[in-house]
């Protein structure tokens, strides 16, 4: 599969060959679902906590006698039926974390990259940086490729200047080639990849797959 490499001015420069084992797979939507669900679950703090009837502070005294008042029966003021009483089956702190098998996670990332590459969502840009670190300079580049869409920028290294220039753009997020996130890739309307990052992504997943198979 070939993709056109664009300059920062939006001019087509050359073609780059995308690795079919990473960018040309049939899309497995099942593993994509599990990968996104895992990421979102792992972000949950799980700190929600309510008090049950036995934990609410208060007297255990019966508020009035059982019979003869014409009112409903009451055991104590901590009843879940009363304001300020305990909560029935309320949430308690819990751990929502669950880890996907590494092989499944890699398949999800490759499926997402293939999904974006097979459409028009993925664009390859020549390597560049924003020397000034200014947002306006990065916007001049982005306006050729994304018009206010939710955009993901995949970098080949930790470019502090480029990230500084983009941190004021709410629709833009940066990912490293070896730390992709399924949620960002799936919901990104545009995926911009630096040319070097394309090769690094392919090398990274090839080496991981080879290590898994015992051939690396």
Curated annotation (Swiss-Prot):
User: What is the protein's given name?
Assistant: Large ribosomal subunit protein uL4
Say if the entry is tagged with keyword Ribonucleoprotein.
Answer: yes
**What does the record list as coiled-coil region(s)?**
none
Keywords from UniProt, A to Z, are: Ribonucleoprotein, Ribosomal protein, RNA-binding, rRNA-binding
Compositional bias segments (type: Basic residues): 64-76
Q: Which SUPFAM superfamilies did the record assign? A: Ribosomal protein L4
Quaternary context? Part of the 50S ribosomal subunit.
Any one GO BP annotation for this protein: translation
Q: Which GO-annotated molecular functions does the record name?
A: rRNA binding; structural constituent of ribosome
Q: What family does the entry list?
A: Belongs to the universal ribosomal protein uL4 family.
Sorted alphabetically, which Pfam families does this protein's record hold? Ribosomal_L4
- The yes or no answer to whether the keyword Ribosomal protein is present is yes
**NCBIfam families membership:** rplD_bact (TIGR03953)
Q: Which region ranges are annotated with the description Disordered?
A: 51-78
Q: Its biological function? A: One of the primary rRNA binding proteins, this protein initially binds near the 5'-end of the 23S rRNA. It is important during the early stages of 50S assembly. It makes multiple contacts with different domains of the 23S rRNA in the assembled 50S subunit and ribosome.
Family annotation (InterPro entries):
Ribosomal_uL4, Ribosomal_uL4-like, Ribosomal_uL4_dom_sf
Protein source organism: Treponema pallidum (strain Nichols)
**Gene Ontology annotations for the cellular component aspect, listed alphabetically:** ribonucleoprotein complex; ribosome
């Amino acid at each position: 599969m070939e993709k056109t490499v664009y300059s920062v001015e939006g001019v087509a420069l050359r073609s780059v060959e995308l690795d079919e084992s990473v960018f040309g797979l049939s899309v497995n939507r099942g593993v994509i679902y599990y990968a996104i669900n895992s990421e979102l679950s792992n972000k949950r703090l799980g700190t929600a906590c309510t008090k049950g009837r036995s934990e609410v502070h208060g007297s255990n005294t019966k508020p009035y006698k059982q019979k003869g008042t014409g009112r409903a029966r009451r055991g104590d003021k901590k009843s879940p039926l009363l304001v300020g009483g305990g909560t029935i089956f309320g949430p308690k702190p819990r751990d929502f974390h669950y880890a996907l098998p590494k092989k499944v996670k890699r398949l999800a990332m490759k499926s997402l990259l293939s999904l974006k590459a097979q459409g028009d969502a993925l664009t390859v840009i020549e390597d560049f940086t924003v020397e000034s670190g200014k947002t306006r300079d990065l916007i001049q580049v982005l306006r050729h490729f994304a018009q206010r869409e939710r955009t993901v920028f995949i970098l080949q290294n930790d470019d502090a200047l480029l990230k500084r220039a983009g941190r004021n753009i709410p629709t833009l997020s940066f990912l490293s080639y070896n730390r992709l996130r399924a949620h960002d890739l799936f919901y990104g309307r545009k995926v911009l990849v630096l040319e070097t990052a394309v090769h690094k992504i392919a090398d990274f997943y090839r080496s991981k797959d080879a290590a898994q198979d015992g051939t690396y």
